[in-house]
Amino acid sequence: MEFNMYDEKKLLGVIGLCRGAGKAIVGVPMICEHLRNTHEKRGEVKDVIVIEASDTSENTHKKINDKCAYYGVEIVRIAAGCEELGHALGKSAVAAVAIADKGFFAAVKKQLSC
């Protein structure tokens, strides 16, 4: 899926708001832990979307894709790189972020469908 810069900026803005509200899980290890814990507690993982940077390593890409496939979680690879995604989250570089809130999930899906 490709984005023009305007859509990408809006998407990164929504992701930044998620982080500010404490509804974003940042980094591959934290995402994997969240998916595992949520699955153990509820038996299913709902209203979670994982956003992966375009320049993640092959190993990271495989790891996050395998986890998302196992738990049935949607994953989207965006045009922004690790540095840009990290900047939107107030960090240096981030390979992936998960949105785990129903409202923000809907907002991110809306930006992805533009």
Spans of model-derived segments:
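N-terminal first-folded block
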Residues: 7-52
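Solvent-exposed alpha-helical segments within well-ordered globular domains of core cellular machineries
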Residues: 13, 33, 62-66, 87, ...
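Short, glycine/charged-enriched secondary-structure capping and boundary segments
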Residues: 40, 64-67, 91-92
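Feature captures the catalytic cores and cofactor-binding loops of soluble hydro-lyases/lyases
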Residues: 45-46, 56-86
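Conserved residues at beta->alpha junctions
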Residues: 54-55, 99
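Short basic, glycine-rich beta-strand/loop surfaces that mediate nucleic-acid
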Residues: 72-114
